[in-house]
Amino acid sequence: MSEKPRRDTGGTGTGSGRSTGQSTNRTSNQQTGTGRTPTATGAHRQPANQSTGGGRSSSTGGRNTPTNQGNARPAAPANARSGNQPARGNNAPAASRSGGSTPAPVRGGGATPAPARGTNTRNARSQQSRGRPQPEEREREREAVLRRPPTPTTTRPVMRPRGPVALPPVMTVRELSEATGIGAADILKTMLKAGMIANINQQIDYETAALIMTDFGIETVENMPEQMVGIVEDVKEVLRSQPPEEMRPRPPVVTIMGHVDHGKTKLLDAIRSTRVAEGEAGGITQHIGAYQVEVNHRKITFLDTPGHEAFTAMRARGAQVTDIVVLVVAADDGVKPQTEEAIAHVKAAGVPMIVAINKIDLPTANPDRIKQQLAALDVIVEEYGGNVPCVHVSARQKINIDGLLEMILLVADLEDLRANPNAPAVGTIIEAKLDKSRGPVATVLIQNGTLHLEDNVLVGCVAGKIKSMFSDSGKRLRHAEPSTPVEIIGLEGVPQAGDILQVMDDLVLAREIALQRQRQQRAEAMAASARGTSLEELFGKVKQGQVKELNLILKADVQGSLDAIAHLIEQLNQSQNEVQTRIIHRGVGAITEGDVNLALASHAIIIGFNARPDPAARRHAEQHGIDIRFYNIIYQLQDDLKKAMAGMLAPTFKEVVEGYAEVRNIFRLPTREVVAGVYVTDGKITRTGQNVRVLRRGVVIHDGKISSLKRFKDDVREVTAGYECGLIVEGFNDIEIGDALEFYRQEQVAATL
């Protein structure tokens, strides 16, 4: 039977050792008799200097005398201090008054010794956490679960649709996967193979989706939303669908085409009796102007297209909306490349043509030569047995202008041009710009129906309500009939030249369709960008130094100028492959501070074509050194772009031989360098800036530089023909008597496109 613990107030170190021994013996007896293993509190001797003060100490089997004088208690084990609670049992030790505790004995097992003095508590924690699964084990378990095949109850077979699948004009990859039953991952893989980098939420257009589905053997059809039914995509289809009894004669739309400076604007100026040409920069029309004149109580609408070759796209748009083309050819200059280009556009548009041979008042005029040149291009005039009318005029002297107008009306009567003035208006945007005070302004040619004030319109990707209309002379209009060019205000954005204008009953519906078209346009642009980026051909060449880029930000007064500059840059890029010009941003209107920031971030040059920076943008550009170039003549911009691109080309070098010499003696220095005693036979030797080529029996054995040049013991800069000298070829000691030396210089030659 265990004794009760007693208080010992006068114990010494000897008593402490006696108490320890008794405790140990009794613990051993308890292990033999009961099979329970208490913690041996007296197994480790505690130093005297670790006394913690007075208190009552308890023992599991007998008395435990304090080790030091002063009523001290034994120190708690390390695992008790680490926060482990003692197990409760019959032999659980009693807690001391100071709150310390000793671990309880563990039933059915061996004794768990208390950690020795200085044991780290982290070891105790790691021992206790050995039973927990480690991160590697948890990862292996997770992978095993992922590899586990799905149960039959959760497996759902993919149902491929039968027959064509109806797809919207714009959709995400996820929506395409849901509509076709093809996994999104498979679709993304197919897009990646096709050079398109996308994600599951990226929008794609119907054409891209249909192309992807062909790889999976699925047919698709485009499902047009109900609100898209009735939207005009082709004006010719609208004209063909009109009731014949509603059709009325309309004025002809005439486009004047021809080579630069052949007198197109002068001819139109003579017709309108105004000075349009004097207001144009450099005498060249910068954007399409639409004008209407009255001849013999009949109206004729003229489109004045630019004459330079860079405005190819603008001339093409003019041919698409025109009824008759007047091809102007200068009698003293003949057929030029732009003349041939205009003929190609006319033939592609399938519209009748009238040849106007201008400048017949000049003494060098030769109309017959012009007709022969046209016949070589399959444009046979009536005098030569063809069906193309030909009129001789002089725009400067206003000779035979009436004859040209009568010929236009005659051809218009033969074409029987008609439209329905009672239908909702449909037209084509000729030009569009952003006016600082009036907002978006567009010039539209009405081709069918009548446009009224307050009409709701859909124009490409923008919508709006017609707030005001102006004629070509600036007169306010309340309505515009077919073949009438008008300037409209009230659109919610700047449309693109060539967009179709259509009157809508509901402005909300027009906005929804415009928004959907914008999304489709963005999806097409993203798809094109993804295809270009995934190829990485151009960018790879740029990184390798094979291709250099010239970044541009384009701002112009009208959309047509932007299109023309973009066409010009495309031609420059196609003409060579070493330097590529990239338009990182283009827009209509003034140069803003945002444009300057973009140029600063992308190391770009800002081009302002009839566009100037606002004060904030100008100050910002001056502070950061951003280059802003201003132009109002297209061919000046073309020349500067060529010069800028040529400056980015790798320079070429030309070899210029400046002297010859022969080796007549050899001197070896203690530094193991070899001095060649040479005689200059031709030209001169210069110590700096020259390379030397060593030839032995006509074969080049070394090419290097001169490290030293002397005459006798003096260093010299130059030795001319007929003199001897000594020189050291840098890094070459194998020179021999009889070798020939050739001295040359590399001169840089400016690169050209």
From Swiss-Prot:
Residues 249-418 form the tr-type G domain. Residues 133-146 have a biased composition (Basic and acidic residues). Residues 258-265 are annotated as: G1. GTP binds at residues 258-265, 304-308, 358-361. Residues 394-396 are annotated as: G5. Coiled coil: none annotated. Keywords: Cytoplasm, GTP-binding, Initiation factor, Nucleotide-binding, Protein biosynthesis. Residues 283-287 are annotated as: G2. Pfam families: EF-G_D2 (PF22042), GTP_EFTU (PF00009), GTP_EFTU_D2 (PF03144), IF-2 (PF11987), IF2_N (PF04760). GO terms for molecular function: GTP binding; GTPase activity; translation initiation factor activity. PANTHER family: TR-TYPE G DOMAIN-CONTAINING PROTEIN, TRANSLATION INITIATION FACTOR IF-2-RELATED. This is Translation initiation factor IF-2. It comes from Chloroflexus aggregans (strain MD-66 / DSM 9485). The gene is infB.
